[in-house]
Amino acid sequence: ILYHLYEGGGVRIDGPSILMRKQVGPSTSFVTNYYVDMISSASIDVITTASPYSEERTQWSVGMDYLRGNTTMSVAYTTSTESDFDAKTYSFAVSQDMFGDLTTLTLSYALGDDTVGRSDDPLFERDADRQQYGVGLTQILTRNLIATLNYQVVTDEGFLNNPYRTVRYADPTVPRGFSFEPELYPNTRTSNALGVRMKYFLPYRAALEAEYRYFTDTWDIEAHTASISYTQPWGDFVFTGKYRYHDQTG
């Protein structure tokens, strides 16, 4: 059982999460998760109109892991519901340990089926499909050092706009003198991401982790993200400090 809370920039997000796992036999396990985000916000638009904003997102997921020799196969289904967005995701992954369990190769695939709506228009409904392909390689380099390399491709197709975002323009044909036009984005998008992570285990159960991620897509967005973190267990608690740098163009 977990309770999460984030507060900053006029936004508060909190809610519970319940995770249950059941072992069935020596090779199979099932897992289910219930997760809730309760969001209250006061963005610049909300502040200027003096109107508070609240939202709740509920997510359910169920999955199964099957171990055979040095191979682990996983399947999962996740559904997420909120007032203006419904998402269903089907995923599959297979991992293979090799070379004396020092190397792990992981292949993954996920299919997303989303429905985009508007909270102020019950008749508005648009579809968006998403496919995600991933490959990962984890290598134990020394007794204390482990490295992971991940590559991911995501293809999106369908309604990729923000349904609430519009542009106001002068329109002499209407009495008020202006009209609104919804934003227009391409209905396809392909993104690529490459990430590398290294973790070094220190004395007293501490660990130092460094990570870098490069992202690019067909909408001419390019991003670099780097982070470094330090983890120190102390009794029943685990303390983590992290610094993250992000640079994006496009």
Question: Which functions belong to the PLM regions below?
Answer:
Residues K22-V24, Y66-R68, Q96, Q139, ...:
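Residue-level signature of outer-membrane beta-barrel architecture
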Residues S27-T32, N70-V75, G100-L105, R143-L149, ...:
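Repeated loop/turn-to-beta-strand initiation elements of outer-membrane beta-barrel proteins
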Residues Y6-D14, S54-E56, T79-T89, P186-T190, ...:
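Solvent-exposed loop/turn segments connecting transmembrane beta-strands
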Residues Y3-Y6, V46-S51, A76-S80, S91-A93, ...:
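Extracellular loop and loop/strand-boundary signature of outer-membrane beta-barrel proteins
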Residues I1-V24, T28-V31:
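Short glycine/proline- and aromatic-enriched beta-strand/turn motifs that initiate or cap beta-hairpins
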Residues I1-L5, T32-V36, V75-T79, Y90-F92, ...:
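Transmembrane beta-barrel strands of outer-membrane/channel proteins
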Residues D14-I18, T58-V62, K88-F92, T103, ...:
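Hydrophobic, lipid-facing positions within transmembrane beta-strands of outer-membrane proteins
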Residues V11-P16, N33, S43-T48, F85-A93, ...:
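Outer-membrane beta-barrel translocator domains and adjoining extracellular loop/strand segments
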